[in-house]
Amino acid sequence: MLRSIVFSKANSGVLIMLFQTDIAGTVVWFVLFFALIFLYPRIMLSQLIYKIEQSAVRIETMSQDAMKITARKVDKNVSKELKNKIEQFSDFFVIEPSNIDPYGLVKKIDHTIRGMESRFDEFVEEVAGDKSYSEKQEINYGIRATIGLRQISKIVRHYVEMAKKFKNLQIAMILQMQLPIIEKIAESEIKGAEAFVNGWPIGDSIGPLVAASYMEKSKEIAEDIMASTTVIEGRKCFVLKAKGPSPHLGRDDEAIAAIMKKNKIARIITIDAAQKLEGEKSGSVAEGVGFAMGGWGQREMIENFLIAKKMPIDSIVVKVGMTDAIIPMTKDVYDSVPVVQDFIKRAVRRTKKSNKIIIIGVGNSSGIGNDKKEIEKVKEVVDMLDKKKKEEEAKQKKGGWF
């Protein structure tokens, strides 16, 4: 009897201890649970801010590197004054004309673009007045790529600071999700700056490259536009491209008007680079209708001019990746030239043999000369860059963990 009483008391003590432990554990668990509800977003925000801060620093470093690349083209011994001038000019901006009254908007845009072009020319003349015309153009477009990268770095930094200042998790998350694409674009801008200052062809140069493949002797017929005549499939063709091999875009609208003033044109064929969809092969070719030209202003003026004449317009595009248009031309894009030429032949055959046609290689002429003899030089540069790219990829693969 006594033993059973002692045993029951011992069991009761154990049960009380267990019960007390369960209560303490439950209280601790609830405290931790509610603490984490408040602390987890803070921890997550801190991690996100750390990551986006690193990305912002990387992009800012790229921006500084792009400035150095351009400055070295001006002078190998970069002075502090030159560096400051380029850095100040990299904040250059263009205000879009008012569109409240759409009448005359295209002319407003054209006027603004011409003003921008003049301002770039003036700045290059100021910092590199002793350079040749071709070198000035390379510096000019190198600065444009530098400005693009500078703006990207400033926008990223703006949102990083916004997330920090207001401790805003949503801003940090949205930015962090977009950063892989933004960094890819930033990388393409610095590669573009390098391509421009070295006079290399870029992805957007495929149109002028195709046009140059038809040119024997060319002459300038409008602002920065070279023209040549050739016969394709028995039809007389006027071939146009921006002046090269230094970077130019040219005034295609003026060139078209000059030719059509003296000749009866039956068809216009445009060749340009176009952004591919993910999954499509870079360098693939497609055809359609309409004037293939990016940007705004000049295309609208051309379309207004041609629509009044009910002119058939064919478009042939070479598909390039999201960032391929500004980076040095890849081998896939270069190898599309014969395919584009086949598309041109088919388009030309849709007109009578007595008809005259205008063929326009739309795009930046960086690295592309003004006749077919220059094509071999382009091939050498593309092969050199392709070899360099493969070596870098092999080095990265060798240095990886797997």
Model-identified regions with their sequence ranges:
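Intrinsic disorder/low-structure terminal segments
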Residues: 1, 6, 88-92, 401
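Electropositive, gly/pro-rich neighborhoods at or near active sites that engage anionic ligands
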Residues: 50-209, 213-217
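PRPP/pyrophosphate-binding module of the type I phosphoribosyltransferase fold
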Residues: 360
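Arginine residue identity/basic-tract feature
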Residues: 3, 42, 58, 72, ...
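Conserved mixed alpha/beta catalytic, RNA-binding, or beta-rich assembly cores of soluble enzyme
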Residues: 155-329, 334-339, 345-346, 353, ...
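N-terminal signal-anchor transmembrane alpha helix of single-pass membrane proteins
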Residues: 1, 6-16, 20-45
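Membrane-interfacial segments
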Residues: 44-47, 218
